[in-house]
From Swiss-Prot:
Its EC number is 3.5.99.14. Pathway: Alkaloid biosynthesis; (S)-reticuline biosynthesis. Belongs to the BetVI family. The keyword Signal applies. It is a single-pass membrane protein. The chain crosses the membrane at residues 210-230. SUPFAM superfamilies: Bet v1-like (SSF55961). Gene3D superfamilies: 3.30.530.20. It catalyses: (4-hydroxyphenyl)acetaldehyde + dopamine = (S)-norcoclaurine + H2O. This is S-norcoclaurine synthase 1. The lineage of its organism: Eukaryota, Viridiplantae, Streptophyta, Embryophyta, Tracheophyta. Detected in roots, stems, leaves, flower buds and germinating seeds.
Length: 231
């Protein structure tokens, strides 16, 4: 009987079951979508400005920056730049559109960070734009560094994540040029408005008091001159 009873039937069964399981696993693996590889990129532009860090930051962080960009600093650049949520602070959402032919043509962005202590502002694209062209994340970051009391550096950065197959295409499209233009017009705007006395920049809040003091001094000096009092 020992010669007649063998494990061959069990071996055959195990082999059949094993092959079946391997086939099922193969089918299952084919049905699982492959995880797309993402690349994280960062590009930065820096420019030095001969004015105080606070004066530049006051414009970048201003709740009125959307209107200022649309109507004063970059007139005609935007087809639309509307605040659709918020009041200019963190959480504000902008709906932006450019004239026909611009890339990207339209998108929405959100102010996610405004840190006055660090002079740091971050704005994230939340709809449209590069998000429809292969990017899964896109953010503008503005950081103002004080160099001297009367000079600063504007650091403008773009951080984005893109699907690997679109990386080459997006690298050609995404540049710091828009942020460079913004830094240029904001710097020019501030430099035109600044007031210096003996090489020191006078903050806007002090200008009225300074002007008042100068007027008083002139009035006193004029009165002394009329009265014949030696100056």
């Amino acid at each position: 009987m020992s010669k007649l009873i063998t494990t061959e039937p069990l071996k055959s069964m195990a082999e059949v079951i094993s092959n079946y399981a391997m086939k099922q696993q193969s089918v299952s693996e084919r049905n699982i979508p492959k995880k797309q590889s993402l690349l994280r990129k960062e590009i930065t532009y820096e420019t030095e400005v001969q004015t105080s860090a606070d004066s530049i930051w006051n414009v970048y962080s201003s709740p009125d920056i959307p209107r200022l960009l649309r109507d004063v600093l970059l007139p005609g650049v935007f087809e639309k730049l509307d605040v659709i949520a918020g009041n200019g602070g963190v959480g504000t959402v902008l709906d932006i559109a450019f004239p026909l032919g611009a890339v990207p043509r339209r998108y929405k962005e959100k102010f996610v960070k405004i840190n006055h202590e660090k002079r740091l502002k971050e704005v994230v694209m939340i709809e449209g734009g590069y998000l429809d062209m292969g990017c899964t994340f896109y953010m503008d970051r503005i950081h103002i560094f004080e160099k001297t009391p009367n000079s600063c550096v504007i650091e403008s950065s773009i951080i984005y994540e893109v699907k690997e197959e679109y990386a080459g295409k997006m690298a050609k499209l995404i540049t710091t040029e828009p942020l460079e233009s913004m830094a240029e017009v904001i710097s020019g705007y501030v430099l035109k408005k600044r007031l210096q006395v003996f090489g020191f920049e006078i903050k806007p809040k002090l200008r009225f008091n300074l002007l008042l003091c100068l007027i008083i001094c002139l009035v006193i000096a004029g009165g002394m001159f009329v009265a014949g009092v030696p100056l």
